[in-house]
């Protein structure tokens, strides 16, 4: 099942990744881990095919240093990364994605969050393979309450998945899983992955 553990600091842990990879489930690892911790867990068997490092608005030099460090210390290559910020529409964000795509053409890139087809278009044109969709619908997300910005999750999934298909990409539904059936609804709306955990 294409489920991805959320990159929240109490969910996207190395321990979670080790447990989930046994079932071929992916894990967006929290961005609060240091390089040496990554090396330690990769050497313990953390599979980089299922466990993706998360970045925010880091400079390309930080991403380059991380990928090079992991390869040098573990003999394993980072296969996918997740870019995660609350507002995926800002210019600086799309610029970082473009720089990363240019530097690492074979790397899988998932970026977000957005809730509109225009946001999907922006991030996919910048080089993302997948786009995280969801603002304000997460179990502990207070974006809608504090900023007034948000969008119903199912509606966002439907609209954004249609746009992603135009670029041969996919969306990751991020948020809105609260009751029985929400995961199924996300897949029915066209999501390639459903991110869960809060």
Q: In which residue ranges do the predicted regions lie?
A:
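Active-site capping/gating regions of soluble enzymes
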Residues: 170-198
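Active-site entrance/lid segments in N-terminal catalytic domains of soluble metabolic enzymes
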Residues: 1-170, 198
């Amino acid at each position: 099942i294409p489920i991805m553990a959320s990159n929240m600091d109490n969910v996207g842990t190395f321990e979670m990744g080790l447990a989930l990879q046994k079932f071929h489930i992916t894990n967006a690892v929290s961005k609060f881990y240091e390089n040496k911790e990554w090396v330690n867990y990769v050497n313990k068997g953390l599979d980089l095919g299922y466990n993706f490092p998360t970045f925010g608005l880091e400079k390309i030099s930080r991403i380059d240093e991380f990928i090079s460090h992991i390869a040098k210390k573990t003999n394993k290559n980072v296969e996918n990364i997740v870019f995660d910020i609350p507002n995926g529409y800002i210019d600086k964000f799309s610029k970082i994605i473009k720089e990363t795509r240019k530097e690492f053409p074979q790397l899988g890139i998932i970026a977000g969050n957005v809730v509109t087809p225009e946001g999907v278009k922006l991030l996919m044109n910048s080089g993302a393979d997948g786009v995280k969709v969801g603002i304000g619908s997460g179990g502990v997300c207070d974006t809608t309450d504090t900023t007034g910005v948000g969008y119903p999750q199912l509606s966002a999934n439907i609209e954004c998945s249609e746009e992603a298909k135009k670029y041969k990409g996919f969306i990751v539904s991020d948020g809105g899983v609260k009751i029985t059936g929400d995961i199924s609804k996300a897949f029915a709306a066209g999501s390639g992955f459903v991110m869960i955990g809060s």
